[in-house]
Amino acid sequence: MPLPTMTHSSSFLRLPATSSPHPPPADDASAAYAVVVLNQRLPRFAPLLWDRARLRVCADGGANRVFDGMPELLPAEDPDQVRMRYKPDVIKGDMDSIRPEVKEYYSNLGAEIVDESHDQDTTDLHKCVSFITRNPPGSEESNLYILVLGALGGRFDHEMGNINVLYRFSNIRIVLLSDDCSIFLLPKTHSHEIHIERSIEGPHCGLIPMGSPSASTTTTGLRWNLDNTSMSYGGLISTSNIVEEETVRITSDSDLIWTISLRN
């Protein structure tokens, strides 16, 4: 029996007036976006995604990044007005990184502060994703996209913890984003169609079997396609591949990490 197909698109990074050579996936128009901001430098497109999101959550010190970083990304605007406009709905985590004055500022503006310092077994991103899945901004979980800003860069163990969250919540569409690339999980329960937004992403990409080896992965749309190919750490992994077509199709017997470069 063929696997059900999951479609993917980075159309959320497309500027509002930008056209695309192909329409977004059918479920894209009904997508409900939630943004999570972690404690790393904001990517250049943070204001765009913030405006598209229905729910905005800062993970602890991520609130500092919004407070400091949004005015830097919008230098032509009054910093105080920017800070008031880009107010998180929720600040959640251990509360060991957020500056006291930032916490007070957003609390006074009505942000919900959720102190989970009692929980030292999960990361701040895990806590935020758990909160969003319990309080989804849309009516259907299948339409939920969680866009994570600041998930890459900084300490390697933090990056690996963030990637682990993709596996912990494999039934949720979670995209890790930096200025340089995006990363998301391709669950083995589905075949996958990735609609490439050439104006904003590519051409470099990778398919990585981080959770477990893959005995069989097949792709189309790449320069170096895989044909029932096995992949594992210590063996072959598909890095520095090149997107050749508008749609990349992937099937695998293992969960895979997909990553693609983002254009400046």
Curated annotation (Swiss-Prot):
Top-level taxon of origin: Eukaryota
This protein's GO CC annotations: cytosol
Recorded metabolic or biological pathway in which this protein acts: Cofactor biosynthesis; thiamine diphosphate biosynthesis; thiamine diphosphate from thiamine: step 1/1
Main location (coarse class): cytoplasm
Catalytic activity: thiamine + ATP = thiamine diphosphate + AMP + H(+)
Segments of this protein annotated with the region Disordered: 1-27
GO-annotated molecular function: ATP binding; kinase activity; thiamine binding; thiamine diphosphokinase activity
Positions with biased composition (Polar residues): 1-12
EC number(s) stated in the UniProt entry for this protein: 2.7.6.2
InterPro entries given in the database record: Thi_PPkinase (IPR006282), Thiamin_pyrophosphokinase_euk (IPR016966), Thiamin_PyroPKinase_B1-bd (IPR007373), TPK_B1-bd_sf (IPR036371), TPK_catalytic (IPR007371), TPK_catalytic_sf (IPR036759)
Claim: Cytoplasm is one of the keywords in the record: yes
The entry's keywords: ATP-binding, Cytoplasm, Kinase, Nucleotide-binding, Transferase
Pfam short name (any one): TPK_catalytic
Subcellular location field: Cytoplasm, Cytosol
Record-linked SUPFAM superfamilies: Thiamin pyrophosphokinase, catalytic domain (SSF63999), Thiamin pyrophosphokinase, substrate-binding domain (SSF63862)
Any single biological process term in GO: thiamine metabolic process
Function as written in the Swiss-Prot or TrEMBL entry: Catalyzes the phosphorylation of thiamine to thiamine pyrophosphate (TPP). TPP is an active cofactor for enzymes involved in glycolysis and energy production. Plant leaves require high levels of TPP for photosynthesis and carbohydrate metabolism.
Similarity field: Belongs to the thiamine pyrophosphokinase family.
NCBIfam families xref list: thi_PPkinase
UniProt-recorded name of the protein: Thiamine pyrophosphokinase 1
